């Protein structure tokens, strides 16, 4: 009953306003004690408080679960405010045994109740240091010490809104001061009565401020910052000072929720008016309630924490009181916290238990019903099959707390949970494949599982997509490869063009002979470099610098090689040339016999040809130049082949007529060339010359890619001389020098071609020659290289010198030449 009377006196004094400064100066000064006191200590404090009489001061200490004693005497110790006014330095900068945390001095005197508190900025304990106090059980202390420390701590909370930098002092350091304070126990009793002579609750409006600063206090985890604001009653200060050091910073909400229900008086919960007048706090509690309703997992987690924490902190309720607005709001929030899971639609996982296991897929599904339904009712096929086929999937989609629906339930649904699937198209798609492989197995075994079919369809589509990606990759790779090949081809063509231009190559490049290097040669600008024993392909043996051939190595590099630097088997080369030119030499002989014997020579090879072959024999085939031996068999063809050859022959006639007229002028000189070739029969170029002469009549018709006949004729003319002169390297060097002079002096570009041969008139008399004129003798034979104009031509004499010769100095055989060409035209036209 004493507790109830104290509550009534508290409520009465709480409703009466008073001076705020007096309240601040006279309010009890609780201190923060980290740790937990045993229930026996609490009972002893209650008994001690009851022995003091019916004094009213216990508003502050009586509602606190641990402070059952009164304030120390007024003249015992100086207050912290008085010391701060006297001393420029705060006493907390240098910690001593007891004073740094609780502010107790051995020679302190209790402050004057009438003195107004000046809100200085002393260094007070850090919030972090307060929250870091461990929760070890504290040794029971004398009641006087607790009240003395309570007054000092309340003073600290009044003066110290800003945290200082002084570290806390361990609890063990407080023991030396217990004996001193216990001696003054008898003097403490009247102090609360003097303090209560003044109004306890000066500002009623201060009670509303904790609602505004509660969130800040929870965010900053700093309890001392809220203490100057929460001064609605000493009960508030008691709750604040006793509750804050016990709770760690991160466990404030949970600890407060459990600390609020307990009070020093059983079954009594104080609800001061300040809590009713704080709309901000109620709004915050409502907002938190809404958050807890929406955030289900968080509430479950908090519920588990609430169940676990009483075991960890069994005596926490004794540290807090429920008299303050802050404590009351936390009590309400704690009640709501414990009650909210009941209002949730989904109970916690501990109540629900493990979720039901997912039903396994049926191994076999009979689809005969669906076929009958499709054949009977096409309109109902989207209802019954889907309702039955969707039986296995629905249980996972339903809430776990609900029992599984009966089998007939899906038929009543307006639409299936899955999108409608047409059964017939998969059957139609699968049917032709199974017809090919198993001849209608689907009809016999009921088409198998529809789910498996659809899964296989999905796999098939995935394979198609992957195959498309592969095809795209292949296409890209092929494009890259084609581009690389094109680039390489272009590079090869470019190199080939450069080589053709550099070495004046015409027509396809053919390998005439293979030779082996007999020594190491370090090539020059146009010369080929090779090592001893390396295989060299001879590309051209004519129209080269004297004593050199055009060769190619296995690496693909071109250049001139000296004939003395390679070993050549002339016998094999001659046999090869003869086999290559086996067919063309026949028309050459006919050409020298003025075309009349062509049919006679060609007759043995064309026994099956028609009678028209006597007039014009079929020309060699297109491949005659390359495959001479095989062409003999090709000539023994039937009449259609003869027709094709005659057509090609007529085309060749037009091409011959279109060529230069000077081609035929060299025919008269052919006998000389043939004689020289017969003399040099051991040398291999003679068959090549005969091939070139034969091209005049036949080969030039079909071999459009081969070098023009005039060039080859000139090569044939010069080959006999060069090969005869190969034994004399001096003449070869001289010839090369003359060719260089020709190109330099006469600015002659291109290959040196002999248009025709002629003779100097015998009536020529010696005269002076110019720098570019060729010194000639009467009756000397000349080779015409270029027809410069109507008065002079560029000629070459037997010595290999070049120069201009007047046409008047030459034998006038133009008429004969042109008549011969005309005759050739007549023969061609026939």
Curated annotation (Swiss-Prot):
Biased composition (Pro residues): 344-362, 391-407
Major localization listed first in the record, in broad terms: cytoplasm
Processing and modification events after translation: T-cell receptor ligation leads to increased tyrosine phosphorylation.
UniProt superkingdom: Eukaryota
Gene Ontology terms, MF aspect: lipid binding; protein-containing complex binding
CDD domains named among the record's database cross-references: hSH3_ADAP
CC per GO annotation: anchoring junction; cytoplasm; nucleus; plasma membrane; protein-containing complex
Region feature Disordered, mapped onto this chain: 1-501, 601-646, 660-739
UniProt motif SH2-binding: location: 461-464, 595-598, 626-629
Region (Interaction with SKAP1): 347-447
Keywords: Acetylation, Cell junction, Coiled coil, Cytoplasm, Nucleus, Phosphoprotein, Repeat, SH3 domain
Modified-residue entries (Phosphotyrosine), positions: 570, 698
Chain's role: Acts as an adapter protein of the FYN and LCP2 signaling cascades in T-cells. May play a role in linking T-cell signaling to remodeling of the actin cytoskeleton. Modulates the expression of IL2. Involved in platelet activation. Prevents the degradation of SKAP1 and SKAP2. May be involved in high affinity immunoglobulin epsilon receptor signaling in mast cells.
Subunit structure: Part of a complex consisting of SKAP2, FYB1 and PTPNS1. Part of a complex consisting of SKAP2, FYB1 and LILRB3. Part of a complex consisting of SKAP1, FYB1 and CLNK. Interacts with CLNK (via its SH2 domain) and FYN; this interaction allows SKAP1 and FYB1 to recruit FYN to the complex, thus promoting the phosphorylation of CLNK by FYN. Interacts with FYN. Interacts with LCP2. Interacts with SKAP1. Interacts with SKAP2. Interacts with FASLG. Interacts with EVL. Interacts with TMEM47. Interacts with LCK.
PANTHER family (UniProt xref): FYN-BINDING PROTEIN 1, SH2 CONTAINING ADAPTOR PRAM-1 RELATED
Name of the molecule in the record: FYN-binding protein 1
Source organism (scientific name): Rattus norvegicus
Gene from which this protein is expressed: Fyb1
């Amino acid at each position: 009953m004493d507790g109830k009377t104290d509550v009534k006196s508290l409520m009465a004094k709480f409703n009466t306003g008073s001076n705020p400064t007096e309240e601040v100066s006279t309010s009890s000064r609780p201190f923060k004690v980290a740790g937990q006191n045993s229930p026996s200590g609490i009972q002893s404090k209650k008994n001690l408080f009851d022995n003091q009489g019916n004094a009213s001061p216990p508003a502050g200490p009586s509602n606190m679960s641990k402070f059952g004693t009164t304030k120390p005497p007024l003249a015992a110790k100086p207050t912290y405010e008085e010391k701060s006014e006297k001393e420029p330095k705060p006493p907390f900068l240098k910690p001593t045994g007891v004073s740094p945390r609780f502010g107790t001095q051995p020679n302190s005197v209790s402050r004057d109740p009438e003195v107004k508190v000046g809100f200085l900025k002393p260094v007070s304990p850090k919030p972090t240091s307060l929250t870091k106090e461990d929760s070890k059980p504290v040794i029971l202390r004398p009641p006087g010490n607790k009240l003395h420390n309570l007054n000092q701590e309340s003073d600290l909370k009044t003066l110290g809104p800003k945290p200082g930098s002084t570290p806390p002092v361990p609890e063990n350091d407080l023991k030396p001061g217990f004996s001193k304070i216990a001696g003054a126990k008898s003097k403490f009793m009247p102090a609360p009565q003097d303090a209560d002579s003044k109004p306890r609750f000066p500002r009623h409006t201060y009670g509303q401020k904790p609602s505004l600063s509660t969130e800040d206090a929870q965010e900053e985890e700093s309890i001392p910052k809220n203490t100057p604001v929460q001064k609605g009653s000493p009960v508030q200060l008691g709750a604040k000072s006793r509750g804050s050091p016990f709770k760690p910073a991160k466990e404030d909400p949970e600890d407060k929720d459990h600390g609020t229900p307990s009070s020093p008086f059983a079954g009594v919960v104080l609800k001061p008016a300040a809590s009713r007048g704080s709309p901000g706090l109620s709004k915050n509690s409502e907002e938190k309630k809404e958050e807890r309703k929406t955030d289900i997992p968080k509430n479950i987690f908090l519920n588990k924490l609430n169940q676990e924490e009483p075991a960890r902190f069994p005596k926490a309720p004794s540290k807090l009181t429920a008299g303050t607005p802050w404590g009351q709001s936390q009590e309400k929030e704690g009640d709501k916290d414990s009650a909210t899971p009941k209002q949730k639609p989904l109970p916690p996982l501990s109540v629900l238990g493990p979720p039901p296991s997912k039903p396994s897929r049926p191994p076999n599904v009979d689809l005969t019903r669906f076929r009958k339904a499709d054949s009977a009712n096409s309109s109902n096929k989207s209802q019954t099959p889907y309702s039955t086929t969707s039986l296995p999937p629905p249980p996972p989609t339903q809430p776990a707390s609900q029992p599984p629906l009966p089998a007939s339930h899906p038929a009543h649904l307006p639409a299936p949970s899955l999108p409608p699937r047409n059964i017939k198209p998969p059957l139609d798609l699968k049917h032709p494949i199974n017809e090919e492989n198993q001849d209608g197995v689907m009809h016999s075994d009921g088409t198998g599982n529809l789910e498996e079919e659809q899964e296989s369809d999905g796999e098939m589509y995935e394979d198609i997509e992957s195959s498309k990606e592969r095809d795209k990759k292949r296409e890209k790779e092929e494009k890259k490869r084609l581009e690389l090949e094109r680039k390489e081809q272009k590079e090869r063509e470019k190199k080939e063009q450069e080589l053709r231009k550099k070495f004046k190559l015409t027509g396809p490049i053919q390998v005439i002979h293979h030779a082996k290097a007999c020594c190491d040669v370090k090539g020059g600008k146009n010369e080929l470099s090779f090592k001893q024993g390396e295989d060299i392909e001879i590309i051209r043996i004519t129209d080269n610098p004297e004593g050199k051939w055009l060769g190619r190595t296995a690496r693909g590099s071109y250049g001139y090689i000296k004939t003395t630097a390679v070993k050549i088997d002339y016998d094999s080369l001659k046999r090869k040339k003869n086999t290559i030119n086996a067919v063309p030499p026949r028309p050459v002989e006919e050409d020298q016999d003025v075309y009349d014997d062509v049919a006679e020579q060609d007759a043995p090879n064309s026994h099956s040809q028609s009678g028209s072959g006597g007039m014009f024999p079929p020309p060699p085939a297109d491949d005659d130049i390359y495959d001479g031996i095989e062409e003999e068999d090709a000539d023994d063809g039937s009449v259609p082949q003869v027709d094709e050859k005659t057509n090609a022959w007529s085309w060749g006639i037009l091409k011959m007529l279109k060529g230069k007229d000077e081609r035929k002028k060299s025919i008269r000189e052919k006998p000389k060339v043939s004689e020289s070739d017969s003399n040099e029969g051991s040398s291999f170029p003679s068959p090549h010359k005969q091939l070139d002469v034969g091209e005049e009549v036949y080969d030039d018709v079909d071999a459009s890619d081969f070098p023009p006949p005039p060039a080859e004729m000139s090569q044939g003319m010069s080959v006999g001389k060069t090969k005869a002169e190969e034994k004399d390297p001096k003449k070869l060097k001289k010839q090369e020098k003359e060719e260089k002079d020709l190109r330099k002096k006469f600015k002659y570009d291109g290959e040196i071609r002999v248009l025709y041969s002629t003779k100097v008139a015998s009536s020529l008399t010696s005269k002076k020659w110019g720098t570019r004129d060729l010194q000639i003798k009467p009756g000397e034979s000349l080779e015409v290289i270029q027809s410069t104009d109507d008065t002079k031509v560029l000629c070459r004499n037997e010595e290999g010198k070049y120069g201009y010769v007047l046409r008047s100095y030459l034998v006038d055989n133009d008429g004969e030449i042109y008549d011969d060409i005309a005759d050739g035209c007549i023969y061609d036209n026939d």
